[in-house]
Swiss-Prot record:
InterPro entries: ATP_syn_F0_a_bact/chloroplast, ATP_synth_F0_asu, ATP_synth_F0_asu_AS, F0_ATP_A_sf. The chain crosses the membrane at residues 18-38, 76-96, 105-125, 134-154, 179-199, 201-221. It comes from Helicobacter acinonychis (strain Sheeba). Pfam families: ATP-synt_A. Its main location: membrane. NCBIfam families: ATP_synt_6_or_A (TIGR01131), PRK05815.2-3 (NF004481). Belongs to the ATPase A chain family. Signal peptide: none annotated. GO terms for molecular function: proton-transporting ATP synthase activity, rotational mechanism. One of its GO terms (cellular component) is proton-transporting ATP synthase complex. It is a multi-pass membrane protein. One of its GO terms (biological process) is proton motive force-driven plasma membrane ATP synthesis. This is ATP synthase subunit a. Keywords: ATP synthesis, Cell inner membrane, Cell membrane, CF(0), Hydrogen ion transport, Ion transport, Membrane, Transmembrane, Transmembrane helix, Transport.
């Protein structure tokens, strides 16, 4: 990509895909190391990183149980929690000058959206059975089924677009906002913009996690879904 903003990955290659992949891997390594540090020497009375992580887990489960129930919230936490944490770290790494958010690349957010899309359909089919699961797409009124079924199919595929573009658009916009602020005031650290981007990064990770649980609830809760 021409006129790309310089990042630390440019020391190795200027290829767009390489740069995105570099920060995807770097974010994963950082998340793993920080999570490892939080889980080592676990204490009955949590302190430091352990306390932060336990607070995050409790907050996620508290919100998720209102969507899908406590049992299923815990069951699907490994997926939803990991995605939320990874999206958060991906968003935060872009705040650092000369670093780039993996979530500022649509190809990466598309992969995340596809993971959620295929997984919740897999779970819906596994829990309800193939025919019963897709029968819900036709709606309760039989004569409307020929109209409702294709509408539902389009609706589900549109979730891929909405999930990926929402995250990509917000983070890309945040990165451009930060770049402009740094160009305008290069000798003064723009504290306010950094704080705005920090909270926006948390918000986008939260939204992605919530939508993951919402889609799973719609797929596996036979009494309340669809």
């Amino acid at each position: 990509m021409e006129h790309r903003v310089f990042t630390v990955a440019n020391f190795f290659s200027s290829n767009h895909d390489f740069i995105t992949g570099f920060f995807v891997v770097l974010t994963a390594v950082l998340m793993f190391l920080i999570s490892l540090g939080a889980s080592r020497k676990m204490q009955m009375v949590p302190m430091g990183l352990q306390n932060v992580y336990e607070s995050i887990i409790s907050a996620i489960l508290s919100v998720a149980k209102d969507i899908i129930g406590e049992e299923l919230a815990r069951k699907y936490f490994p997926l939803a929690g990991t995605i939320a944490l990874y999206v958060f770290f991906s968003n935060m790494i872009g705040i650092i000058p000369s670093f780039e958010s993996p979530t500022a690349s649509w190809s990466f957010t598309l992969v995340l959206a596809l993971i959620v899309f295929f997984y919740y359909h897999f779970e819906g089919i596994r829990v309800q059975g193939f025919f019963k699961y897709f029968a819900h797409f036709a709606g309760p009124v039989k004569w409307l089924a020929p109209f409702m079924f294709p509408i539902e199919i389009i609706s589900h595929f549109s979730r891929i677009v909405s999930l990926s573009f929402r995250l990509f658009g917000n983070i890309k916009g945040d990165d451009m906002f930060l770049l402009i602020m740094l160009l305008l005031v290069p000798w003064v650290i723009p504290v306010a913009p950094f704080m705005v981007l920090f909270f926006m990064g948390i918000l986008q990770a939260f939204v992605f996690m919530i939508l993951t649980y919402v889609y799973l609830a719609g797929a596996v809760l036979t009494d309340e879904g669809h």
